[in-house]
From Swiss-Prot:
Segments for region (Disordered): 191-232
Cellular component, GO annotation: host cell Golgi apparatus; host cell nucleolus; virion component
Species per Swiss-Prot/TrEMBL record: Elephantid herpesvirus 1 (isolate Asian elephant/Berlin/Kiba/1998) (EIHV-1)
Keywords of the record: Host cytoplasm, Host Golgi apparatus, Host nucleus, Late protein, Virion
Inducing factors: Expressed late in the infection cycle.
Protein's UniProt name: Protein UL24 homolog
């Protein structure tokens, strides 16, 4: 059911809180800072793993508020933590399920998370393990304290690294990232680097082999040249 009885001002407050959270994550420069904002949902095993953040990614029917993608290249594991934010002006989450607005937000958020996880998990292939976690976090609007969060199961599948990289590149919301870059404070050193598409071990191996062949050819030409000079 649509929550038409929610005042326009409260809707604006919710949108503003979303943006405030996204800015805070964008400006954060470490795993710990981001994990504190997200109430500790990030896997501790990836504390030292390179990662990239995506906001309002266009996944077709869904646009997750935030995605954090960890790329463990040596182990060939991609871990995607997908987060949907819901906000409330109330000081507590109604566990008795009598708050109609919160219950609507809860069901809507669960559908959004479920659909987004399904879309990301659909990029199958070989060569890389893909783990997708989908979280729904309820924040109190004035304190940004997490009042409630869902604890999902992890969707695990095999994927093709470059196909998944192409999905991330295609779905990145460039205009929203540009908005974050312009609106964040001058203390921000810049957006986090996009990790996918940079690591290409297969290509680098081919290039190395090619370079070796070129070196060998050059050496052979040099030896032939010396032989010619000696015969002359």
């Amino acid at each position: 059911m649509p929550v038409n009885f929610v005042a326009a001002r409260k809707k604006r407050d919710g949108v503003n809180t979303h943006i405030e959270l996204q800015k805070a994550i964008y400006k954060s420069r470490s795993f710990t800072e981001i994990n504190n904002i997200l109430d500790g949902i990030l896997p501790d095993a990836h504390r030292e793993t390179p990662f990239a953040t995506y906001f309002e990614a266009n996944l077709g029917c869904r646009r997750p508020d935030c995605m954090i993608v960890f790329d463990d290249l040596p182990k060939q594991i991609i871990t995607c933590v997908l987060v949907e934010f819901k906000t409330t002006s109330r000081t507590a989450f109604d566990k008795r399920k009598k708050d109609a607005v919160q219950q609507y937000q809860l069901h809507q958020g669960e559908e959004q998370v479920r659909d987004a996880v399904k879309i990301l998990s659909s990029i199958t292939g070989r060569g890389c393990n893909l783990r997708v976690w989908g979280f729904l976090l309820f924040y109190q609007q004035s304190t940004l304290r997490v009042l409630h969060k869902t604890i999902p199961e992890c969707a695990v599948t095999l994927t093709d690294r470059w196909a998944f990289s192409a999905l991330l590149k295609k779905s990145k919301n460039e205009s929203f990232h540009a908005f974050l870059q312009k609106s964040c404070t001058a203390s921000t050193t810049g957006p986090q680097k996009e990790l996918f598409g940079i690591h290409k071990p297969e290509n680098s191996e081919v290039e190395t082999v090619g370079a070796t062949k070129s070196t060998r050819k050059g050496a052979e030409k040099s030896r032939l040249s010396r032989r010619s000079r000696k015969s002359n």
